[in-house]
Amino acid sequence: GATILVPILTGLSVSTTLLMAGLGTLLFHFLTKGKVPAFLGSSFAFLGGYGAVAPMVNGAPNKEMLPYACGGVFCAGLVYIVMSALIKGFGVKRVMRFFPPVVTGPIIIAIGLILAPSAIANCKTNWVVALVAVATIIIFNIWGKGMLKIIPIILGVAASYTVAACMGEIDFSAAASRSWIGLPPIQMMKFDVSSILTIMPIALATMMEHIGDITAIGATTKRNYIADPGLHRT
């Protein structure tokens, strides 16, 4: 859901986002030696930064400022690389002392609260589909067995999409009119101090979210991915 919705809200290309999400996930599994069952998608956490640097203009992408927002996200990626090197050099325990659960927990909660208005706004468009998604996720998360318990979000998306299709809420004409093969739009990044300072610090929040996600995945699979393959690899 986020992988599609984030580019729509920011004015980026959905197809390019899906391509980069796939390539990023493959690179992630290469770096983690295929040990961590995770998919890398878009992050809602950067929406605030994007909105501040490149707000939509009458529902259309801000083509003038969007390259600066992309430049800020690029710099946020550099923060990930620096933190990975610090964790590798000083060890997980030394670095994690500065990020105890009392710090990481509220940050993750804050990110969730930031996303709440967007979720409610989307639910208002069709409460039936929204309730089907929520009910499916809750049912499989609580009573699911084996693999079904691990992928409740995917099952919720599949169930709600099926219901939406049966209700005629999905317009397939746009997909039918598109070509099967095409090149992604090429856009060069631009860098500005204000856009970098606005977006780059968000990387600290998403890193806390990442640590929580890796810990949650480890709890589900009963493995310690912080130790093996190591937090710096993830």
What are these regions (language model features)?
Residues 9-12, 34, 53-64, 88, ...:
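Juxtamembrane helix-boundary/capping and inter-helix hinge elements in multi-pass membrane proteins
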